[in-house]
């Protein structure tokens, strides 16, 4: 049986000192975590080495917030798999809506990152999602289909997590109805053609909606932004019922 993956994306938050304080409060809150789930946290690059000294638990792993498709070279501001693996990083987020928006990241680039992550021994968490305008025009399924087909070409679904993050729900307080999110996740599973692929939902996930989200048949985890910055809130999400 696949484990649920509860992932926190800290984005551009948390210094090394703040990371240490967070983990010292957070880890005792998840010590009795059920064995059907795993927690993954993506700290900023500067805090990864601090985090790595706390990641020797079976239920807690580190993710990178991005990854390049080469191991070294003249790629200013990028980071390579071998740099991350040195610090016990196991996962890498790729294709998040923010680099798609702010840096015009394409499905082709996302695919290169995902494929190289897998070939380097990391598990990519590939984000897909539609804008509010696309949703209102009835284009959500078409957009998701394109992102999955182009962004996940030549990837191994047995070493892959897909995060469905409707862009209009990220950091807005608006949450996609759990049943609607489940339909998109079912579509993604059908497109992948592998029943055991892990599919997360992301977008204003909070302690007061996690139980409903995780009750859905095709949702196997969550990718959490703001609520992962508070150890008490994130521990409640991790200990969903």
UniProtKB/Swiss-Prot annotation:
Q: Which organism is it from?
A: Prochlorococcus marinus (strain MIT 9515)
Q: Per its database record, what is this protein's job?
A: Involved in the gluconeogenesis. Catalyzes stereospecifically the conversion of dihydroxyacetone phosphate (DHAP) to D-glyceraldehyde-3-phosphate (G3P).
Name one cellular component (GO) term. Answer: cytosol
Protein's UniProt name: Triosephosphate isomerase
What catalytic activity does the UniProt entry give for this protein?
Answer: D-glyceraldehyde 3-phosphate = dihydroxyacetone phosphate
Coiled coil feature spans: none
| Alphabetized HAMAP family for the sequence | TIM_B
Recorded superkingdom: Bacteria
- Binding-site positions, substrate: 9-11, 171, 204, 225-226
Keywords, A to Z, come to: Cytoplasm, Gluconeogenesis, Glycolysis, Isomerase
Pathway info: Carbohydrate biosynthesis; gluconeogenesis; Carbohydrate degradation; glycolysis; D-glyceraldehyde 3-phosphate from glycerone phosphate: step 1/1
Can you list the disulfide-bonded cysteine pairs? none
Protein family according to the UniProt entry: Belongs to the triosephosphate isomerase family.
| EC class of the enzyme, as a word | isomerase
């Amino acid at each position: 049986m696949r484990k649920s993956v509860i992932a926190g994306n800290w984005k551009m938050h948390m210094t090394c000192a703040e990371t240490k304080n967070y983990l010292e409060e957070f880890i005792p809150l998840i010590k009795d975590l059920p064995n059907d789930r795993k927690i993954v946290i993506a700290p900023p690059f500067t805090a990864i080495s601090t985090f790595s000294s706390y990641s020797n638990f079976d239920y807690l792993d580190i993710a990178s917030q991005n990854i390049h498709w080469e191991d070294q070279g003249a790629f200013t501001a990028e980071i390579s798999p071998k740099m991350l693996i040195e610090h016990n990083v196991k996962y890498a987020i790729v294709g998040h809506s923010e680099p798609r928006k702010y840096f015009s990241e394409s499905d082709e680039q996302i695919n290169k990152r995902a494929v190289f992550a897998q070939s380097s021994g990391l598990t990519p968490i590939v984000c897909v999602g539609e804008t509010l305008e696309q949703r209102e025009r009835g284009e959500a399924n078409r957009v998701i289909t394109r992102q999955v087909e182009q962004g996940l070409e030549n990837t191994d679904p047995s070493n892959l997590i897909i995060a469905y993050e409707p862009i209009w729900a990220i950091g807005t307080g608006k949450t996609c109805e759990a049943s609607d999110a489940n339909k998109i996740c079912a579509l993604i599973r059908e497109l992948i053609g592998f029943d055991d692929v892990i599919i997360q939902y992301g977008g204003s996930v909070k302690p007061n909606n996690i139980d409903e989200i995780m009750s859905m048949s095709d949702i196997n985890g969550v990718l959490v932004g703001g609520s992962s910055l508070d150890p008490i809130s994130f521990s409640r999400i991790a200990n969903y019922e």
